[in-house]
């Protein structure tokens, strides 16, 4: 099994193999997940002080905050898994 890494902005990288979900931070349940992760010490803030636009949830219950759009992270995730997608325009 090869390790795949995804750039989530500002030089920060997460392991694609460990990502469970990439979601928007707007809903109340996601805000609760962020708050709970902060209380447990499992929140990673990779926004560099900018507005949180994507919340990445991992299989280890860590929650990563990113300043780039969830669609952008998801696109990087798909392109990483299937390089042929990089050649096609959506």
Swiss-Prot record:
InterPro entries: RemA-like. It holds the Pfam family RemA-like. Belongs to the RemA family. HAMAP family: RemA. This is Putative regulatory protein SYNPCC7002_A1845. It comes from Picosynechococcus sp. (strain ATCC 27264 / PCC 7002 / PR-6).
